[in-house]
Amino acid sequence: MSAHIERTIVPKNTDPTRTHLNRELIMFPDGVCNRTLAIRHRLDTAGLKRKIGKNQVQAIRIVLSGTHEDMARVEGEGKLDEWCADNVKWLRETYGADNLVSAVLHMDEETPHIHATVVPIVQGERRKQKKEENARRRYRTKAPAPRLCADEVMSRASLIRYQDNTWRSTG
């Protein structure tokens, strides 16, 4: 997916005369030059205590867009920058500013859209821990620490809430 976002592999549905209009909406930290390194940097600086499993989700890719007609209207009214700023603001508020490692506006495809990359780091007790309160065995409770958990960030209830909130926030 990074190859598509960074245009190291050019999809057939792009217009090469508009590729120069694509732009990064989030700057990488110093010493970081691409999305893969930005994800690694976030994982290394998040203060995670647990080992990251080899099959564990380390990043979530999100595409933000509208219908072709809606996006043409936004672009035609000169409100594309405002639309981008509203979406980046929503992403930061929803997933955390530190967890949003990349956002790129693609203008070289038929419909303008944003590709965002989020590292799913959450704080607080595990959802499973809440269920274990009624269990027979009690384990020592640990202080809440940052943890990598895509299941919590992308639960069904969260996805419904995100759809409602992003529509309200970005119109």
Regions flagged by a language model, labelled:
Residues 1-171:
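N-terminal nicking endonuclease/strand-transfer module with a His-rich metal-binding environment
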